[in-house]
Amino acid sequence: MSALALAPVPAPTPSWRTDRLPQLRARVLGGGPTGALTALALAQAGWRVQLIDPLSGSQLQARRRAYALSHSSRMFLQRLGLWELLSEVAVPFRSLRLCDLEAGRAIGFGLDDVGSCGTRADGAEAVGWILQHQPLMQRLLEQLEAHAGISLSLGDVASPGGNAESSGSAGPQLPDLLVAADGSASPTRRSAGIRRWRLPYAQACLTAQVRLRGSAPDQAWELFRREGPFAVLPLGDGTTQLVWSAPAERLGRLEALDPVAFLDALATALPERLQPEALLERPRAFPVALELARRFHRGSLALVGEAAHRCHPVGGQGMNLCWRDVEELQRQALRAAAGELPPAAVAAAYGRRRWADVLLTLLFTDLLVRIFSNRQPLLLSCRRLALDLMARSKIGRAHV
């Protein structure tokens, strides 16, 4: 019997694991930091990628903004092979001072509070990093243009660099994956009929770059004030980025002040040891809201970054949350490229796995704003107690 036994018949291979596998294509709509990183991550997963944005490369670089990067973002960039390039322009901060000015409490976070995860690949250590928009986008665009698996269509003219779709094959063909990385107002999300929840804050946010005295060059500050959170982020060479949250009417008045009057107003908002010296750019105010798409996918469409969610800037969580979207999308794209997941299921798998992290982050930032902008006596007492306990607990500081 054994000699006549038939060999087991292998299960038929699904069609998506054969003829379509080498032709996996993605189209990314939106060329900002999240869209650019998405294109690079998908290309590294073996997909052919077309990146489309109505703005030109120079326009995409033109924003004056700074981002706080956490260790989760740094480790993801390392896996993509981008950290060595970006660390050249990322300013590390090795100390973070959290001050509750209403409760009269302050606590410091240093390298001991991040442990071994604070060690960068080049041997330097940091609590986090500050990365300005222009050098970030310059380097991401250079990587996009150099990648053979990526085609750029920026502005009104498609880029001749990147030969993946130069024959026009990505244009008329439907991609296996469509990624909306086109921001909070996302026309792609709206055209897909995906609604969102939106909760405007009573606060707005003002950003400016100033030169300060009294702060170490590698120290960041998170100040909790009665009118809202206030972050002071080091940019190197004595320059700092301010992220000032306050009622919109007040910020509108501050935005209209001349430089001398603005610095005088700024001095009253900062701790005494921080003395403003010079205003380096015109302050700009913008509204702040908590936003959450009601779903992160529809069919082969996946929403990433602010097309899917938006949180208050307190704690510098925004960019890190967006890039964790990219990391999860790449994880599912790798499964599809390996034949473990139908390409048509990538967006759905991504959407399911992102909900918990996004909801927790939005809840965390929202609670920070509501608790630390509240002068209710019981809450003030609780804040003092919480910060006192945290100051005495290394484990507590490590989990902030």
Q: Would you name each region that the model predicts?
A:
Residues M1-R27, Q44-A45:
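Extreme N-terminal leader/targeting segments of oxidoreductases
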Residues A43-R65:
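Glycine-rich FAD pyrophosphate-binding loop
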Residues W16-P22, M75, R79, L85-S191, ...:
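Conserved N-terminal helical subregion
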Residues A5-T13, R331-H399:
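C-terminal helical "tail/cap" subdomain of flavin- and related membrane-associated enzymes
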Residues G252-P342:
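FAD/FMN-dependent oxidoreductases across multiple families
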Residues L77, L177-R284:
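Conserved FAD-binding catalytic core of PHBH/FMO-like flavoproteins
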Residues T34, G57, A185:
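Conserved Rossmann-like nucleotide-cofactor binding loop
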Residues L24-L51:
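N-terminal Rossmann-like FAD-binding beta1-loop-alpha1 element of flavoenzymes
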